[in-house]
Amino acid sequence: MAKSSSSSSPSPAAASAATTSSAPPLPASYEAALQELEGLVAGLESGQLPLDQLLTGYQRGAQLLKFCRDKLEAVETQIKVLEGTELKPWVQE
């Protein structure tokens, strides 16, 4: 009987997985991610958020930053393919 009562409580790993699965999905575009990230930074810098929201905002910001960096890296790779293996510097006309 003791075995069944201990199996009813979720393990820390299961609780962690449940927390991460409830995270909002990543934005559909770089621009949407950047806009959300800018809003988060403004909220964090305001100093008006409670501590738990600061942590949540920081974690979401880290996700968005990784998303934006990955998108930029993918575009850079595509540009390299279009221009050969060497990325040429952009010159504004």
Curated annotation (Swiss-Prot):
Disulfide bonds: none
A GO cellular-component term linked to this record: cytosol
A Pfam family reported for this protein in Swiss-Prot or TrEMBL: Exonuc_VII_S
Enzyme class, first EC level, given as a word: hydrolase
Cellular localization per UniProt: Cytoplasm
Annotated stretches, region: Disordered: 1-26
InterPro entries from the UniProt entry: Exonuc_VII_S, Exonuc_VII_ssu_sf
E.C. no: 3.1.11.6
PANTHER family: EXODEOXYRIBONUCLEASE 7 SMALL SUBUNIT
Protein name (record): Exodeoxyribonuclease 7 small subunit
Source species: Polaromonas sp. (strain JS666 / ATCC BAA-500)
